[in-house]
Amino acid sequence: MQTDPFKEYLKQQEPDKKYKGYAWQTAIGLQAVDGLKPSEYLVDAAIQNIEGKITLDEVKNLLDSYYEEKPQKNHDRTEEADKVSIRIAKILSEHAFSFTPNEYISIHRKLFTGIYDHAGKIRDYNITKKEWVLNGATVIYGSASELRKTLEYDFMKEKHYSYKGLSMDEIIHHLAVFVANLWQIHIFGEGNTRTTAVFFIKYLRTLGFDATNDIFAENAWYFRNALVRANYNDLKHGIHETTEYLELFLRNLLLDEKNLLQNRLMHVDYKEMLVREPKIEYKTSEANIENRKVNIQLEKVNIGMFGEKISGISKKTIQHMEQLCDSFDKNEIFGRSRVEEVTGLK
């Protein structure tokens, strides 16, 4: 993978730079939930903002001018990724927040005005979405006729919930249930996961959680898949909705734990995948184990590097390649249908 230019800022002692770095890294990382990747132009502008050379408003103006001069059709949705990224960074940089359905809807409007016609509007039609993690099945999303009432009910229930006396395990479980239920309503036609993530981060702050690390930025697709698994049942095949994956994510986010967050572990057919993997024989030895450990990071394919060396390869193709690397073992055999499920290509 390409080096993250924002990671160094998370180690900064200067609070302003550290927080700006977190806001930008999260904003850009969240685009991965829809398979989007911002432009290098935005990344460069973001770094200038973190360094204090330009303001967020100036970044926005630069970006608007950039796309006015580049009006051609953007098939990989880079313009959407760029504009939504700066809007997320701006919202995360603001302290104002109210725990209300209107705030939730307002965040969607702020993120997607000029991008989606339905920005800030509750959908009036029912939806299904094929999910890779469910092997092509869909979550049952909220009914169009009941969306507003369902949203208001979830907010009312959470607002009157008391965290007093709960252990941290109980708090994290409850937060996982709350955000999973909020996302399942899927009140908008598009942009639900990014809206939910931004709202949830803002809400966590009101509960006293800092959450200024790179967990959302580096595991945005995991977050979405964990939300899916928290809302899916197939009892006939022994599959039950579970918040266990979401809780692992939250423990890393809120408690700085180092739980393994791997998408393929959530796949409903993961056990079958294990059966197909070659067996490895382990032998006890007094040898220096440290020298024999596999350096997983070095084994990962640097997809971004190939994008620079092969002319004509698009950012969208690179994103699809990254998703495939994340979803399958290097020894796993997979066919066209699995590729379509992971990438959304048909």
Each predicted region: which residue ranges?
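FIC/Doc superfamily catalytic core
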Residues: 1-346
